[in-house]
Amino acid sequence: MSERAPVVTIDGPSGAGKGTIAHLLAKHYGWQLLDSGAIYRVLALAALHHNVELENEEAITLLAAHLDVQFLAGGDKDAIKVVLEGEDVTGAIRTQECSNAASKVAAFPRVREALLRRQRAFCQAPGLIADGRDMGTVVFPTAPAKLYLTASAEERAQRRYNQLQDKGFDVKIDRLLAEIQERDDRDMNRPVAPLVPADDALVIDTTGIGIDDVFAQCVAHINDKLSASGF
């Protein structure tokens, strides 16, 4: 068995089911959980709170270097509590405004470098489930098991619409679809760490597939890869 803690990476676009699967896998294996997207959302929220322009790479990078963020175990409703500068921002970082802002700050190379070490520090025993967009390609390129979840833009927009409606937000599905398509284009075509599957990742299209079936595919793949890697 390796002396290092094993890492399972889960990448893919927003709304593909990464967060749900990551939480289920973390509970299944009893491992640590990293929501990489939350880190960028927290940074974006911190920028908004401190009135830092999202286009100011230097200021955002400085903010990232001193970002005070914690991930704490939550209750049944929130698998992970996200705390920024002592304040619970678990709900605040999930707004569409924060989501769009996170994608913008994540496009800056210096910002990504500033947060890279923070993300890697989450790799602790007994293991880590890392949910993000470049976990398997950049942050944990040697992870023994890698997953890439995707789904049609239309289905992802519908899922996001349902989530926001349940939380009482008044949203238009056509606007959500346009924002998702715009974000996909930005994430997939950015010059640094574009959103692409790792060469050795299992790609799962979750369009029209139940969460239980997706989870079963993931567990089977992870178990095979961990066994082959000596974990």
Curated annotation (Swiss-Prot):
Transmembrane segments: none annotated. Its EC number is 2.7.4.25. It is an enzyme of class 2 (transferase). ATP binds at G12, P13, S14, G15, A16, G17, K18, G19, T20. SUPFAM superfamilies: P-loop containing nucleoside triphosphate hydrolases. GO terms for cellular component: cytosol. Belongs to the cytidylate kinase family. Type 1 subfamily. This is Cytidylate kinase. It comes from Shewanella amazonensis (strain ATCC BAA-1098 / SB2B). The lineage of its organism: Bacteria, Pseudomonadati, Pseudomonadota, Gammaproteobacteria, Alteromonadales.
